[in-house]
Amino acid sequence: MDNKNSVIKFENVSFSYNSKKQVLKNVSYEIYEKEYVCIVGHNGSGKSTMSKLLTGILKPLAGTIYLFGYAISRDNIKFLRDNVGIIFQNPDNQFIGITAEDDIAFGLENRKIPRGEIKRIIDSVADKVGIKDILKFEPHKLSGGQKQRVAIASVLAINPSIILFDESTSMLDPKGKKDIKSFMLQLRNQGKTVISITHDMEEVVNCDRVLVMDHGNLIKQGRPDEIFKDKQFLRDINLDVPFSLDLAMQLNELDEKINSTLRYNELIDNICSRVDQKD
């Protein structure tokens, strides 16, 4: 990442609630332009607090958060919120409008975008996330996955450079989870910086880099394959190994030519290749 531009930088950031024990302890890291980063950790690790700091909901007790090289303060909090969009865990917490269309329009109207331009933007983002047929629907008529698509469309409408998913798949059924994970990859491929705070290790497989939190400390970071190769490390901090890798590792114990891999398609190809060789 040496040639990448830093978009977010945490420099020795600490935070505590009501002067109690610190929930973030001297955390430092950088996230780069067009990168897809997952932040993982067990409950109480500090990852949710980090999302509130990233969006300006909370202010660090100590240290500095930089956005595109600018230190974030009360004076430029609008700059932060214009550039960082967030998709929450519970899509119901994000709905403001009477219909899906109204909800997408809300942020645009606040920015005084002309009505004709609002209609064009809504049609564009609705098409991107596949919700053109539900724009007139009321929230209670939508599934969890549809609500999250509307939430994504609402964020895309204001066109932030960075999109933060805060446990955004945890309340969805398998199809809804698959759809949202696919959108994350699409957004990264379209040039957005994507940050996902998650406990879903199957999602982490597809990201560029993982930040591992434990008891308020950033204890490890690296590519998914670097993080997941140490199963004992993950068990020690109460995190799971993705099923595909766990299965591959077990098969590797039976046949050392079956490589440990994070991806199902690679594992299947590997197994088929070994079967063909033995035939």
From Swiss-Prot:
It is a peripheral membrane protein. The keyword 4Fe-4S does not apply. It is found in: Cell membrane. ATP binds at residues 41-48. Residues 8-240 form the ABC transporter domain. GO terms for molecular function: ATP binding; ATP hydrolysis activity; ATPase-coupled transmembrane transporter activity. Its EC number is 7.-.-.-. Belongs to the ABC transporter superfamily. Energy-coupling factor EcfA family. NCBIfam families: ECF_ATPase_1, PRK13648.1. ATP-binding (A) component of a common energy-coupling factor (ECF) ABC-transporter complex. Unlike classic ABC transporters this ECF transporter provides the energy necessary to transport a number of different substrates. This is Energy-coupling factor transporter ATP-binding protein EcfA1. It comes from Mycoplasmoides gallisepticum (strain R(low / passage 15 / clone 2)).
